[in-house]
Amino acid sequence: MSESSFLVSLLASGSSGNATYIETPQRKILVDCGLTGKAIAAQMEKIGRSVADIDTILVTHEHVDHIKGIGVLARKYGMDIYANEKTWKAMERKNIGVIKQEQKHLFEPGVTKTFGDIDIVSFSVSHDAASPQFYAFQKDQKQFVMLTDTGYVSEKLRKLLYNADAYLMESNHD
């Protein structure tokens, strides 16, 4: 992998589970963990990666198809987990198990954080969850935007998608 690139791999999508892997030379990030820990490990193996190498999990919202394996992975591998305050409270009510305080981090909507060699912007979306958010990943003038589980695409989100070099947009309805 070159210093100016990043890899995006969709591990799972849909009501049975969601997980997306994003890798840069310095960071290995999982967005959502809606499969069991074993299933995430198997999906990572399929793309030639190890679940043990993931250093960060970003959570979009607390629905089980986005957080099913988060507690297991956090306890087994010690990964840092980022979510906004309302999502953390909602996840804890869903009994994700004990996660060490030093692994829990806040990432509120509208904030940009730098993770090694990649900047990540969080943004609010419309969905039936405590405080759903999704992410835009920016590295070396390139931008990838993730947008799933949203009921409405605002003008701000539309502009973000329009200006992205690539984006992932999930569309499904039961």
Question: Could you describe each region identified by the protein language model?
Answer:
Residues 1-47, 133-149:
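Conserved beta-strand hairpin/beta-sheet module of binuclear metal-dependent hydrolase folds
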Residues 9-19, 56-70, 74-75, 88-92, ...:
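Structured catalytic core of nucleotide-sugar glycosyltransferases
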Residues 31-34, 54-62, 82-85, 145-149, ...:
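Active-site neighborhood of phospho(di)ester-bond hydrolases with catalytic His/Asp-centered motifs
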Residues 38-83:
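Active-site metal-binding motif and surrounding structural segment of the metallo-beta-lactamase
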Residues 44-48, 113-117, 157-160:
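Short amphipathic alpha-helix with an adjacent loop that forms part of the alpha/beta core around
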Residues 54, 101, 164-165:
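Short, well-ordered alpha-helix to beta-strand connector turns
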Residues 85-134, 138-141:
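Metallo-beta-lactamase
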Residues 119-174:
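Active-site-proximal loop/helix segment associated with metal-binding centers of metalloenzymes
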